[in-house]
Amino acid sequence: ETSLTIEGVRIVIDSGLYRTQVFDPRTELSHLETTRISMDMAVQRAGRAGRVANGTCYRLWTSASEHLMTQQRSPEIISADLASVVLSVAAFGESNIYNLPWLTPPPEANVLKAQHLLTTLGCINKDGRITELGQKVATMPCHPRIARMILSAKNHDLTKLACDIAAVIEEKDPLTDTTDCDISLRISALRQHRALNRLAQWRRIAQIAAEYRKMVKTNNEDNTNNFSPNDVGQLIAFAYPERIAKAIDCIGSFRLANGNNIRLQQSDTLTASQWIAIASLYAETGKCGRVFLAAPITPSDFDSAIITERDNLSWDNKQGTIVAQHELRIGKLLLKSSPINHIDTADLINTICQATAKHGLSMFNWNDSSVLQLQQRVAKVAEWHPELSLPDISTQHLLSSAHEWLPFYLNNNGHILTNINELKKVDIKQAIWNIIPYELQLIIDRLAP
């Protein structure tokens, strides 16, 4: 499909097919697929045979099938995975990809997704500037996920294992006779076939693994099974940190670091694991994802760069009190928590006010007859005299605006009320009455005593 004129070409045989990069959401990687060409591609190909003299183009399809062909192919940048592109631009020193003169600007959503991934991998910072790790990743001719895994493997003397894992992830799974998703089974099978030089369906995977070893100057293959499944999980987590998953209540159910749920078949050996790292999965929006390739992992093997610390202050409605915990997390997954002994007063008050908007009916005595009577009195006066512009003291409004009136009543001579027994003692009627200006209180007492 080149636009150059090639001397001597008189005949073109067009298969009607071409190889294109397709993004696979299961592995979050791109791979080549053979697919049908569009009509503009067919015209371009036919033109090769008639540039300098009459020529012939043999099209290996029927004229009747042309109505099924799209008229024009869409630019690859519209649907491509942009992680490598964004990283390359950052390596050139440009943090804003839209400062380049694109013929077709990349979709903003795809750019943001790529930036988020590269930030998670540690290849760029939050400002879009490339990091030292990102510089190394950018020099490797593979997807940033794979490059990150192979580079990190060097620090753990696991480079050959990382090359085998990368090859297994990129190709179609040869183990069609098992529903077990443990990728370690594939690594063992690959090494066994490679040692016996009976590759068969493993040939392409072995070739890719060899290419990766050559890329990192580690030419000798490893055909032993002297690797730990947890090593496999650790390497996968370097490439897919958002796909670390923790077991939840039901057997075979896990929650990903991004908050989504996935499920393994109950017969899968990985159901016994507390933590797994997933290399290949498929998940539809709102549905439980299906895992294809994964490995066990232990928290001690987590990359410290993806662990975040935070103080979590929240209202526990079951216990009826504030719970203050210092937490270590990977995404939305809790690794470890410990109680916080000293909490800022403002943070306590803010937490109670936020909880009031959601649980306020059970936290305070809103159903007290005196509270209901006061609300009815004020509502009647507001109905009779709208010109008074009386404040809204309906329960719904007061709950949603608790931060405006409640803080004063939560501080009892320096002691902040933080449990339901203390909050039930707050005089809600008096608190509501004090919201109303004094001159309007007099009018209410006179019109609705």
Where are the model-predicted features located?
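Residue-level signal for threonine
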Residues: 1, 38, 130-134, 143, ...
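C-terminal accessory/connector segments of nucleic-acid motor ATPases
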Residues: 59-194, 204-225, 230-248, 252-266
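Conserved segment of the helicase C-terminal RecA-like domain
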Residues: 8-11, 17-69, 85-87
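Amphipathic, interaction-prone secondary-structure segments
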Residues: 264, 446-449
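Extended active-site and interfacial segments that coordinate phosphate-rich ligands
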Residues: 15-19, 27-28, 32, 38-40, ...
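Acidic, serine/threonine- and proline-rich low-complexity intrinsically disordered segments
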Residues: 158-253, 258, 274-447
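Conserved two-lobed SF2 helicase motor
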Residues: 1-5, 13
